From Swiss-Prot:
UniProt lineage: Bacteria, Pseudomonadati, Pseudomonadota, Alphaproteobacteria, Hyphomicrobiales
Species assigned in the record: Agrobacterium fabrum (strain C58 / ATCC 33970) (Agrobacterium tumefaciens (strain C58))
Domain of life where this protein originates: Bacteria
Keyword field contains ATP-binding: yes
Name this protein carries in UniProt: Phosphoribosylaminoimidazole-succinocarboxamide synthase 1
Enzyme class per UniProt: ligase
GO cellular component: cytosol
Alphabetical list of InterPro entries matching this protein: SAICAR_synt/ADE2_N (IPR028923), SAICAR_synt_PurC (IPR033934), SAICAR_synth (IPR001636), SAICAR_synthetase (IPR050089), SAICAR_synthetase_CS (IPR018236)
């Protein structure tokens, strides 16, 4: 593999310079982190599964007119993406009480919310991603009101799609996180979905058993993360029953 210029490295992914202007290569690592990197482990095969699941979801979103940065998958660990100017927000959509919402408001985990709730968090490891309001976002210039409207519209459409997708394979979409960016095309700019959608960024519960099929398995030391991610991929038809769940793929360029 040719050496490429590294643009950015995060907790679970690395961005490299792309083959053409306006493109990047997104590499999915096997690193699992929680609680702002206070907990860290390398889990063989996680990056491969997240790449495949993200490819599947983003391909379908693109097809139904929800714009994403995804262009195509390059190999088991990498995908070609459009370069965007990232908006420093995590957008969380909640359908069922779980995680920090349950702790913050004293709602029992598993309670279906009266309606889907959208929350915003400012991306900052140093500040541990504090929750912010729409007023904070516009006042500090992280996004203007029109961009915020576009982000919320994207979040609602993604929630509708993902809820139906997972329901069809016996999985409840409890909540999920997305990130968005500004895509510049000539004199035009539009807000599109970026980052990833995978079991790393969603809470997924088996409808019949309520078994967790997401990164909470790692957060709570329940084990079986790769097996759960593999089961999600199998139910979606991404991998077959006999396909191996572990694999190194390309070697990470240092």
């Amino acid at each position: 593999m040719n050496r490429r210029r590294r643009i950015y490295e995060g907790k679970a992914k690395i961005l490299y310079e792309g083959p053409e202007p306006g493109t990047l290569i997104q590499f999915f690592k096997d690193d699992a982190t929680a609680f702002n990197k206070k907990k860290h482990e390398v889990i063989d095969g996680k990056g491969v599964l997240n790449n495949r699941i993200c490819e599947y979801v983003f391909t379908h979103l693109n097809k139904i007119g929800i714009p994403t940065h995804f262009i195509r998958r390059l190999n088991m660990r990498e995908q070609l993406i459009k370069e965007v100017e990232m908006i420093p927000l995590e957008i969380v959509v909640r359908n069922v009480a779980a995680g920090s919402l349950s702790k913050r408001l004293g709602i029992e985990e598993g309670v279906v919310l009266p309606r889907s709730i959208i929350e915003f968090y400012y991306k900052s490891d140093e500040l541990e991603d504090p929750m912010v309001s729409e007023e904070h976002i516009t006042a500090f210039g992280w996004a203007n009101p029109a961009e915020l409207d576009d982000i919320m519209a994207l979040a609602i459409r993604v929630n509708d799609f993902l809820s139906g997708l997972f329901l069809g394979v016996g999985i409840q979409l409890v909540d999920f996180k997305i990130e968005c960016g500004r895509l510049f095309e000539g004199d035009m700019m539009r807000i599109i979905l970026a980052d990833e959608i995978s079991p790393d960024s969603c809470r997924l519960w088996d409808i019949e058993t309520q078994k967790k099929m997401d990164k909470d398995l790692f957060r709570r030391d329940l084990g079986g993360l790769v097996e759960a991610y593999s089961e999600v991929a199998r139910r979606l038809g991404i991998i077959n029953e006999n396909e191996p769940i572990r694999g190194t793929g390309p070697v990470l360029v240092k």
